[in-house]
Amino acid sequence: MLKVKLVRSMIGCNPKQRATIKALGLRKIRQEKSFEDTPIVRGMIKKVEHLVEVSES
């Protein structure tokens, strides 16, 4: 399992990055979600790694 936490604002991000954050289900700063560790989720995290914090649980 991966815990993904939004730590930076989406202000100034391009639309694809905003869509990725939305697809991850993150809306507010400091909001956390848990995901299965799959290549799809890893790819999404890689696209917005400057905005999120990831921990394995």
From Swiss-Prot:
Q: Which Pfam families does the entry link to?
A: Ribosomal_L30 (PF00327)
Q: Which UniProt keywords are listed? A: Ribonucleoprotein, Ribosomal protein
GO BP term (any one)? translation
Molecular-function GO term, any one: structural constituent of ribosome
- Source organism of this protein record: Maridesulfovibrio salexigens (strain ATCC 14822 / DSM 2638 / NCIMB 8403 / VKM B-1763)
What the record says about family reads:
Belongs to the universal ribosomal protein uL30 family.
Q: What is the lineage of its organism?
A: Bacteria, Pseudomonadati, Thermodesulfobacteriota, Desulfovibrionia, Desulfovibrionales
SUPFAM superfamilies recorded: Ribosomal protein L30p/L7e
Q: Which NCBIfam families match?
A: rpmD_bact
Superkingdom to which the source organism belongs: Bacteria
Subunit record text:
Part of the 50S ribosomal subunit.
The entry's cellular-component GO terms read: cytosolic large ribosomal subunit
Protein name (Swiss-Prot/TrEMBL):
Large ribosomal subunit protein uL30
